[in-house]
Amino acid sequence: VLALIFAFSVPAQEAHAEEAYLNEDTTMKVTVTNMSPEYSISDVRPITTMFDCEIIMAFKMDEGLCMTFTTSCIGAAKVIGVKDIKVQQKMWYGWKTVLTSDGAESYDSAIFAADLKYADAIKDRTYRVICTHYADLDGYEEVVNDTGAFKFTY
């Protein structure tokens, strides 16, 4: 009797799938934050005043590779910013630097943001972005951020 009740009380499951078509207005955003594989949850972590150090990448058909760099700290830093920016394209022999920037900085601020575009990005090619976030709030700190590889499609 119990098996008969169970057989009738299970609702039917259905799944529907549909192919999404991308158009020129479609934008894919990729956010990468600085995370250290050196520390696990149970480990003691070093004291830091920086957080939300991000590289946001958007691939746009009419603009190329658009990037936003953000750096935040827990109080107003004497100086805060991003430096040593490299946009690299994957080649058969390794990574080729296709764009560099010295970066930018702000003073007496807790948040920094800057934009950068690489208009010559080629569809179906793989790119990565590397930079150094830094801040000086009771001592200078910096962290290197690497997006890893992302394929430019739209």
Question: Which functions belong to the PLM regions below?
Answer:
Residues 1-60:
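N-terminal prepro-regions of secreted/extracellular proteins
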Residues 47-87:
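Short, surface-exposed binding/anchoring microloops in extracellular/periplasmic proteins
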Residues 53, 67, 83-85, 114, ...:
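Hydrophobic residues positioned within well-ordered beta-strands of beta-sheet architectures
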Residues 57-61, 118-123, 151-154:
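Extracellular and analogous surface-interaction loops
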Residues 73-75, 89-91, 120, 133-137, ...:
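Beta-strand elements of well-folded, non-transmembrane domains
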Residues 84-85, 96-109:
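Solvent-exposed serine/threonine-rich low-complexity stretches and specific carbohydrate-binding patches
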Residues 104-139:
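Short, solvent-exposed, Trp/other aromatic-anchored flexible loops in extracytoplasmic proteins
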Residues 139-154:
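Short beta-strand elements
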